[in-house]
Swiss-Prot record:
PROSITE patterns: PROTEASOME_ALPHA_1, PROTEASOME_ALPHA_2. It comes from Methanoregula boonei (strain DSM 21154 / JCM 14090 / 6A8). This is Proteasome subunit alpha. The lineage of its organism: Archaea, Methanobacteriati, Methanobacteriota, Stenosarchaea group, Methanomicrobia. InterPro entries: Ntn_hydrolases_N (IPR029055), Proteasome_alpha (IPR050115), Proteasome_alpha-type (IPR023332), Proteasome_asu_arc (IPR019982), Proteasome_asu_N (IPR000426), Proteasome_sua/b (IPR001353). Component of the proteasome core, a large protease complex with broad specificity involved in protein degradation. One of its GO terms (molecular function) is threonine-type endopeptidase activity.
Amino acid sequence: MQPQYQMGYDRAITVFSPDGRLYQVEYAREAVKRGTTAVGIKAHDGVVLIVDKRVSSKLLESSSIEKIFKIDEHIGVASSGLVGDARALVDRARIECQINRVSYDERIEVEALAKKLCDHMQTLTQYGGIRPYGTALLIAGVSDGESRLFETDPSGTLLEYKATGIGIGRPAAMKVFEEEYTADLALKDAILLGLKALHSATEGKFDVDTVEMGIVESSTAQFKKMTKEEVASYVGQFKQ
């Protein structure tokens, strides 16, 4: 049963409760909190995204689970929450990148893309007949030689981080980052720190088949998803 004071205020996205809350947005955030853990770490020479794919059955092909997406040559995202909603946002992000190239003949800035996505997500908290996206994104990229890492949430809030996590394991991952992150990390060390955070978030329940990684190096400004062999190499180093 819902509390009496809450009934009626969570029926429509456009209605605030007396204490200033939008319950549908809060419920969308809960969908993110139930999602798999994704972490992002900014190093002095790039950015890394690492995701726990949570293979729920031995019959499931782990390669069919995709939580990290290449958006443009220099930008990638990791998602947590409803996978279908994440795909819709990824498609929109790719279109925004193409529009920018056609209009200005140049790559879109990482921050500009993040703001466009958050503006779109925010509009879905204002109108009836629709619902907020039940997903959050970590947006990693390089602009003008500088590494950037942004986090979105269903309300359209945009925050930039040095290191962060989303999903069910966020508290454990953030504890690791707050204790061990330093701004002078090299990309390889950032990957190992990200694996440590993911290890803590999943209570050690990960291996090469359940981990997905993507990196963008400042020197090349090229985002790439790591191969299974590259992931296995870093997981092996971490477990030594």
